[in-house]
Swiss-Prot record:
Residues 1-8, 77-90, 136-163, 244-247 are cytoplasmic. This is Molybdate/tungstate transport system permease protein WtpB. Belongs to the binding-protein-dependent transport system permease family. CDD domains: TM_PBP2. It is found in: Cell membrane. It is a multi-pass membrane protein. InterPro entries: MetI-like (IPR000515), MetI-like_sf (IPR035906), Mo/W_ABC_Transporter_Permease (IPR053405). Keywords: Cell membrane, Membrane, Molybdenum, Transmembrane, Transmembrane helix, Transport. Residues 52-238 form the ABC transmembrane type-1 domain. One of its GO terms (cellular component) is plasma membrane. It holds the Pfam family BPD_transp_1.
Amino acid sequence: MRRDYTLYLFAALGTFLIAYIAVPIAVIFLKQASDVEMLVKTLHDPYVIEAIRNSLLTATATALIALLFGVPLGYVLARKDFPGKSAVQALVDVPIVIPHSVVGIMLLVTFSNSILDSYKGIVAAMLFVSAPFTINAARDGFLAVDEKLEAVARTLGASRWRAFLSISLPMAFPSIASGAIMTWARAISEVGAILIVAYYPKTAQVLILEYFNNYGLRASRPIAVIMVSLSLGIFVILRWLVGRKNA
């Protein structure tokens, strides 16, 4: 029997990509380990702590807003056919392909000074670029739920709202949760749109760029290490919680 090396080839190709992602993460931690003094100094810098807090809070607020509006939209896209549905679905994906500096210009032109240099501006920029992940995940989650289950619940006397809460939402939850996690992750990584809309109050993403431009790599690297650590930690915990929910 002829030996099939397809899986070995795929594994080798996949390993290259995993290494491409993992190696820079490992290297930045190893480099910072040789400069603990700068890391400790950064951890005690109130300006840095405030910027990190701003990033975490605004990214979390963005994910919650995306859930509030994205889950209902995802449900409608999964359950109903209507004129212009394809256009709506295409529009949902548009923020993914628009350059983020352009997003910042668009938001600034649209909302002007009402979002300039404010928490509202940060959340607005984050929401624009990250909401598609929640909407698409919710839509896919509801599409995976057999609509007949809702119909059976309604024949037994449940309202559409009740059927949604008791059947569709719990069954689609893993997909929705994954979308929310990706929304949060995308939001906390946003820089381009925030630079234009809300340079202040400072977020960690913007502060890293500012420190790099003004003080060089040694000053910006500790903040990057802190953000990678926090993001990875939160991401792993959230994925674990979703995995437990699926089990």
